[in-house]
């Protein structure tokens, strides 16, 4: 996990429609940048739907939500359409941003050890500085917790 108080690494990734986004495009806004393991899985779906349901509240507070996983653009599009997600999903199939943000880690699941994305959420301020980082994310609680951070 990256340290608080540092400049968030800039990046450029395609969204669910294939449109390229840079973190620097969002200068002047707060950014909730959350990394999740996989589209259409139970925890990831809860988290995404929670952010989507609260999306108007985030925009009222001047924040944007960017969800990142190693899934493809096409997978993100299906995920967005299936659940009517109201925010941007970014495809990092080469894991460049996932690794830059230090969320590609060894994970243990039911005794099996493998490498994967550790669910992590960063709050980045209007100047691009990381002001909050959480790698102990509970998928269902993350959207509400991040909304409280903006209060």
Which residues does each PLM region occupy?
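Chalcogenol-based redox active-site neighborhoods
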Residues: 1-151
């Amino acid at each position: 996990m990256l340290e608080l108080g540092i400049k968030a690494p800039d990046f450029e990734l395609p969204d669910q429609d294939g449109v390229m986004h840079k973190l620097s495009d969002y200068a002047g806004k707060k950014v909730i940048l959350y990394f999740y393991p996989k589209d259409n899985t139970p925890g990831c779906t809860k988290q995404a739907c929670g952010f989507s349901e609260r999306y108007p509240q985030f925009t009222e507070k001047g924040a944007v939500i960017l969800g990142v996983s190693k899934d493809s653009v096409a997978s993100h599009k299906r995920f967005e359409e299936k659940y009517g997600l109201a925010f941007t999903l970014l495809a990092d199939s080469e894991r460049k941003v996932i690794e830059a943000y230090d969320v590609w880690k060894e994970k243990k699941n039911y005794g099996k050890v493998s490498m994967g994305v550790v669910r992590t959420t960063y709050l980045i301020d209007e100047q691009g500085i990381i002001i909050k980082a959480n790698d102990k994310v509970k998928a269902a609680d993350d959207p509400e917790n991040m909304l409280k951070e903006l209060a």
